[in-house]
Swiss-Prot record:
It holds the Pfam family Ribosomal_S9. Belongs to the universal ribosomal protein uS9 family. This is Small ribosomal subunit protein uS9. Keywords: Ribonucleoprotein, Ribosomal protein. It comes from Xanthomonas oryzae pv. oryzae (strain KACC10331 / KXO85). The keyword Ribonucleoprotein applies. The keyword Ribonucleoprotein applies. SUPFAM superfamilies: Ribosomal protein S5 domain 2-like (SSF54211). GO terms for cellular component: cytosolic small ribosomal subunit. Gene3D superfamilies: 3.30.230.10. Signal peptide: none annotated. The gene is rpsI. GO terms for biological process: translation.
Length: 130
């Protein structure tokens, strides 16, 4: 018998996360490592768990995640979006609740490119009046 699972893709900044949701006990595995080991900061772990806590599903699913690209914050945000999308695939009634909390929205902010003749994207050389 095939294992029933729900899938969700999440992206944030330059990070991508593929999230698989299966019935289970609440284990979250990111790139074959437990969540607590993968993310050193408590903030990142909290971000990942937000959709589950909101829908009261912390102990109902085992979550398998493949995250790539970007840094810690970007990956945490990508995983959060992926979990939210997978939860909606599992139960459509959760969508309005997750949307209201802002977990269904893709954060479209990306790094602005560095411009020629400037130090950074917007930082110009110091201006001297005289």
């Amino acid at each position: 018998m095939a294992i029933t699972q729900n899938y969700g893709t999440g992206r944030r900044k330059s990070s991508t996360a593929r999230v698989f949701l299966r019935k289970g006990t609440g284990k979250i595995t990111v790139n074959d490592r437990p969540l607590d080991e993968f993310f050193g900061r408590e903030t990142a772990r909290m971000i990942v768990r937000q959709p589950l806590e909101l829908t009261k599903n912390t102990e109902s699913f085992d979550i398998l995640v493949t995250a790539s690209g970007g840094g810690t914050t970007g990956q945490a945000g990508a995983i959060r979006l992926g979990i939210a999308r997978a939860l909606v695939e599992y139960d459509e009634t959760l969508k309005s609740e997750l949307r209201k909390a802002g977990f269904m929205t893709r954060d479209a902010r990306e790094v602005e490119r560095k411009k020629v003749g400037l130090h950074k994207a917007r930082r110009a050389t110091q201006f001297s009046k005289r």
